[in-house]
Amino acid sequence: AILSSNGYFSATYFMSVVTLSNNFIDCLYTMASYYGNFVAIKGINERLIRMIDKKETEKPLLISEDQNKVCFEHVSFGFPNKESIFKDFSFQFDKGKKYAIVGDSGSGKSTLLKLILGYYSIQKGRIISFDKEPVIIRQEEHLFSGTIRENLCLGEKFSEEDLKSAMEFANISDLDLNQFVSEDAGNLSGGQIQRISIARAKLHCHNLLLCDEITSSLDSINTEKIESNIIELTDKTIIYVTHKIHKKMLQEFDDILVLSHGKLVEHGSFEDLLSKKNYFYHLFMNQ
């Protein structure tokens, strides 16, 4: 957090390193009992080192702030020794609009967000983004040992009004900003951890907000509240990955992308996709 506040790297970049560090530590705890974890630890450690050493200019993204879009142009991507996830994938996300991405498990939804973040280098094509520091909320987020305030601010300065607004947004107004978060956030529930992470993203997001299954650990009341607040972010570009097809929520999106095995099989508004009675219709009816 101190390095972040001094401008060495962004808060978003810092949290990516924290997430990988926590994964590395978790593997260390079980290494004595499970030798197989050694391979996982080695891979995570190598990836962590690459991320720390990696310069911003080395990200596999073309940043063009005057483009007002996030554009995939004939993108192909896959992991080594595995079948490609995306082949000649093209789509344009316009600045200021809200997009939902749905599809079966393994369809490439989360990978698409990671490509926007520049986590992976693509094999072909190019990705253009208007935002050099998009913010992501993941399905499982990590908090570090410190106060809730410190976890929200990450070394940056925010007014009390901004903090209050973010906490109301994530429905955590009942928590004390000075409450201490223990190691591994053991004194908080999974839902509280996720809502603190959502509040943190609200504080740090300037333009592009990426959401990856962010309500999976929340109860129905908090889910409805936060989904409603996400929709009301009129000054943000939202790309929202979900496996839950909630009619009330998805009706508010400008466009819904339906992925299957890395392919965009259809897209459009909620009503248009239902009326076609194709892939989206069957996802909705069979959930």
Predicted regions and their residues:
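C-terminal boundary and immediately downstream tail of ABC-type ATPase nucleotide-binding domains
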Residues: 48, 275-287
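The feature captures the beta-strand-to-loop junction immediately N-terminal to the Walker
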Residues: 102-104
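Conserved "ABC signature" C-loop
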Residues: 141-183, 279-282
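ABC-family ATPase nucleotide-binding domain "signature/switch" substructure
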Residues: 148-151, 180-275
